[in-house]
Amino acid sequence: MTVNDAINLLSRNFSIDEAFLKAFIEVETGGQGFDPLTGKIIIQFEPAWFRKKEPYAPSGKWSLNGVERQKAEWEAFNDACKINEASAMESTSIGLGQVMGYHYKRLGYKDVYGMWYEAENDIYHQVLQLCQFLTTDLELMQAIARKDWHTIASIYNGKGYKELAEKLGREPYDISLKKAYEKHSN
């Protein structure tokens, strides 16, 4: 199943605007659920989340990770896995929608391993997890319906998303999302 096939099917099943899903996935991962070079799932390891889960963990590659290329993300993730695999998985956003692993219960999984297993298997499950995440947050769904890009960005990426974008020299998330939505809705 292609990304577009999964989006088309699941946007209808979950009553989510198809153009919004396409825009969201484009902004999050450029439409890539798997690294074309390695075939591994796209990840973003979050050291701050791992530190919350493992406050006494010794520093290492995991603690130095920023927003990096996939090779560096996987090195940091694998380093954290040596300390606590489940905590590392919960501290990492995965797949097309970059849903954080710690949301596994919210998505209906018994543990984080089940969430990762399905996301690593195929694109369909990555889009499914994103749809499950979106539809289990009423405030987020209301913001999507209103096309309230600032609120969507604040809920999904945190209230400091604009400051982070400025620090990284990137376009703010709300602006990127709005532009991508306009592109996909025409």
Name each region found by the language model.
Residues M1-C81:
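Export/targeting segments at the very N-terminus of extracytoplasmic proteins
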Residues T2-A6, R12, S59-N186:
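Non-catalytic cell-wall polysaccharide-engagement segments
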